[in-house]
């Protein structure tokens, strides 16, 4: 997981404005294993970072963090952007829902489908406050060799 997320971060880092910082802790921790489709999973991480960048409106920070417990791998994408009202926390994952003037509202719904149906995981807003930012978490089962 570290490597795939790291590749997405490196790709994305080259495309962000100077007024935006992008931090990633995944290369500094031990390898984390989960059963993923690398191409689909990388697309989801890139989509979350792109949404975070859009929410920043040109300046702020995006923080991508990996962590794990006994059973799960958690990937957090946190921004210091405009935030999401609590009433929309679940709605943002519905097809067609968007707050952008340009967009189809399909990125997060497709992300949810990829995480839930192809990776047996979960994706959710875990914290957000209008004017302060948002954190979205992907949770996957850890992969253990038999």
For the regions a protein language model found, what residue spans apply to each?
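Short alpha-helical Gxxx[C/S/T] motif in the catalytic ATP-binding
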Residues: 107, 111-112
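Detector for a conserved hydrophobic position within an alpha-helical segment of the HATPase_c
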Residues: 115-116
